[in-house]
């Protein structure tokens, strides 16, 4: 095939004409408006349109070509692609849309061609200039050496008003996601639920990488002049991780958590659109989709093999996760064997091995299931529902 080298001005003019024609074909412009933009008559506009349909982009530069390019995409396919994007996949990014074209519609076009078409037609914004090159941090060689936990506030379920928080636990060695769940708010309890689920399923891991949120680390300055000089204690999550021997590593910038930030960029550009296509509009259905469909897809598509096949996860060795992953509060028992906690008066039941617990210091545990228990050393003195009513042994087991 002959090679043509066109002047830059001719190429630039052809690109402008193509962009206007594509916008008119997509219905974003009337044909007479396209003619006005290009500064030509309606009759000339019709000629340009026919030349583009017959010769493709080359026809906009040189109409002396004798035959269409064998690689030219038919105009009907161009219209179908733009219609699909405009009417069904309008909120998809280019890569996601390109995959859907191939998987669901049998349209096999190159990613660059689809991207250029959508950008030229004004259906997607042109990409930003790439940031300066940075050296990637090496992955940890074993599963379980370093895990990330983070949450993203986003409109994950498009059919619901407002935002939802999505909590994710990710392995640095493989980019495998072990846990993902939509919650009304990321806080100490919802984060503990995520960590407990991973520990129960996988075992105890070595280190956890987090941001500087207040439920992970104490962000106040203990020696500030306007604050109490009392040393700042560990957060509930720091205490729980310490009991399991897990190191907490604090990230001081989003760039330090690059692997997690890239996951959010990918998920925000895909997951809401998948939920919309499936017609999912409830929290329960969305979380079911996450567990049964989305996580297997993510781990199959984006996870990588670790450098070493061994695992750094350690099996549980009798640790009481029910106590570890609970909120701990210290109280002193009153003379009536009651304690005050969260506007509740909790009565300690009679005990065979001690006459009274008056003046004793006990620990109150607020568990992840909403129940409350009172602990004295290794002993549980009583367990209560969220309203402070003492539970029977059968109710405790349930």
Predicted segments, located by residue:
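C-terminal, beta-rich DNA-binding module of retroviral/retroelements integrases
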Residues: 292-398
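Mobile genetic element proteins and their domesticated derivatives, centered on retroelements
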Residues: 20, 34, 45-48, 56, ...
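Intrinsically disordered, low-complexity and often Lys/Arg-enriched segments
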Residues: 1-10, 392-398
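Mobile-element integrase/transposase regions
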Residues: 76, 107-108, 119-177, 184-206, ...
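Acidic/histidine-rich, metal-coordinating catalytic segments
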Residues: 195, 199-229, 251-254
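Basic, flexible linker segments flanking DNA-binding modules
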Residues: 56-155, 226-232, 311-321
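Short, basic alpha-helical/linker "hinge" immediately adjacent to a nucleic-acid-recognition surface
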Residues: 1-3, 11, 31-84
């Amino acid at each position: 095939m002959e090679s043509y080298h066109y002047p830059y001005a001719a190429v630039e003019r052809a690109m402008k004409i193509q962009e206007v024609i594509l916008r008119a074909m997509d219905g974003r412009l009337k044909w007479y408006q396209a003619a006005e933009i290009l500064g030509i008559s309606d009759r000339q506009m019709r000629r340009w349109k026919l030349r583009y349909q017959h010769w493709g982009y080359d026809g906009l530069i040189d109409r002396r070509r004798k035959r269409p390019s064998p690689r030219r995409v038919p105009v009907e396919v161009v219209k179908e692609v733009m219609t699909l994007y405009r009417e069904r996949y309008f909120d998809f990014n280019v890569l996601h849309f390109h995959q859907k074209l191939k998987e669901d519609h049998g349209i096999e076009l190159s990613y660059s061609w689809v991207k250029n078409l959508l950008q030229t037609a004004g259906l997607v914004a042109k990409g930003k200039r790439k940031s300066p090159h940075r050296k990637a941090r090496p992955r940890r060689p074993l599963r379980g050496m370093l895990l990330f936990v983070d949450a993203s506030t986003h409109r994950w379920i498009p059919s619901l008003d407002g935002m939802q928080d999505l909590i994710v636990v990710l392995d640095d060695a493989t980019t495998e996601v072990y846990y993902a769940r939509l919650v009304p708010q990321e806080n100490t309890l919802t984060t503990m639920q995520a960590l407990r689920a991973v520990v129960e399923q996988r075992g105890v891991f070595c280190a956890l990488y987090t941001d500087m949120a207040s439920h992970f680390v104490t962000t106040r300055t203990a020696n500030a002049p306007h604050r109490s000089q009392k040393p700042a204690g560990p957060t509930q999550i720091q205490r729980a991780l310490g009991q399991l021997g897990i190191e907490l590593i604090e990230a001081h910038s989003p760039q330090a958590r690059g692997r997690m930030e890239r996951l959010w960029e990918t998920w925000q550009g895909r997951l809401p659109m998948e939920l919309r296509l499936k017609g999912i509009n409830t929290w329960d259905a969305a979380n079911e989709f996450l567990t049964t469909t989305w996580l297997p897809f993510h781990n199959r598509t984006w996870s990588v093999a670790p450098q070493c096949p061994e695992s750094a996860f350690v099996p549980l060795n009798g640790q009481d996760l029910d106590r570890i992953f609970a909120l701990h509060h210290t109280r002193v028992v009153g003379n009536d064997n009651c304690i005050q906690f969260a506007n509740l008066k909790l009565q300690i039941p009679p005990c065979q091995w001690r006459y009274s617990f008056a003046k004793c210091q006990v620990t109150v545990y607020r568990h992840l299931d909403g129940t409350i228990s009172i602990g004295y050393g290794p002993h549980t003195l009583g367990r209560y529902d969220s309203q402070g009513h003492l539970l029977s042994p059968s109710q405790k087991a349930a």
